């Protein structure tokens, strides 16, 4: 009875495992791309950076506005005074109390700074464009990584299928070798070799299954899925056989997001250089203030000291700051900005050159693989027939 219960439990567990495997949802390439656009951490981080650029740009006009600051303060004194004048007169008083209140409102309006504020406003707008381009670039890279990882799983599944088919052939060879040996028509080394080949394929199957699980975990990370998420992928890789290299080369400069980001960095470096050159010019500011002060002395020892004093009023004027010598700091900053501009231009040219080389190499590999598909399929079918039928011509026994 116990044996029957154990067998029943084993059978039930096996059925549940089979159902669980078959119940894994199908993940299409479109769903994988949609998932990475929604949950990919790299894209989310760059969106946060782009939001920061947009926030800074929304306050860009503030550079043209005046600055207004208010200050106030109150001081109360309790002093003991002892004075001796030149004529010999002595004055002395204790616990002399006084109070002072000061309040001011100051305005400073920068009206000219070598047009630096205008350049900065444009620069902030260009940073918003850079943020959008970096997001697009990351989206393209993330989608490419997802597609590569997804179809690598498909490729490894096809490899696993080939291994399983080879295992079936090896199992058939083992059976045939056992039959031939049992009737005295075969040799034991042939049987041993067939078993060795079968065991080798079993080991290859385990290795391949592990590799598929590892690649799936890589895809889970790209998609933002939880570790161990189960799903199935497609069984084939679609191939576009109508790609023309001239079309790809012609649109790369204006559509390749990596090149567009590099070009935008050149624009920002040029604006930074203009900002630094503006520091050579004087700055002109309009200034104004409203001041209020009040002093209250409860007692004095000098008869000419007022017991109460109050002043208030409005003033205005203009302030000019002319840079004369600042230890060559502006010159150094201009040279640094020029070096950065040169670097960004070289980087763009390098990326443009590298992109052209990468497109050329990828297209050559694409042409090679496209030409090899038919030959590989024919060779595989021929090999499969030979393995199925050992007596077919071309089989070496």
List each language-model region with its residue ranges:
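Terminal intrinsically disordered/low-complexity segments used for targeting and assembly
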Residues: 1-35, 84-87, 209-247
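Bacterial Sec-pathway N-terminal export signals of envelope proteins
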Residues: 23-73, 79, 187, 227-270, ...
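Amphipathic alpha-helical coiled-coil segments and their boundaries
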Residues: 32, 39, 46, 110, ...
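A glycine-/polar-enriched beta->alpha junction
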Residues: 34-44, 51-67, 104-122, 133-140, ...
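Amphipathic alpha-helical coiled-coil segments
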Residues: 45-60, 138, 142-161, 215, ...
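Periplasmic alpha-helical coiled-coil/stalk elements that build and connect Gram-negative outer-membrane
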Residues: 55, 141-253, 365, 369
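Soluble, cytosolic/nucleoplasmic coiled-coil alpha-helices used as oligomeric scaffolds and tethers
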Residues: 56, 63, 70, 77, ...
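Small/polar, glycine/serine/threonine/aspartate-rich low-complexity segments that form flexible
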Residues: 71-109, 234-241, 274, 287-322
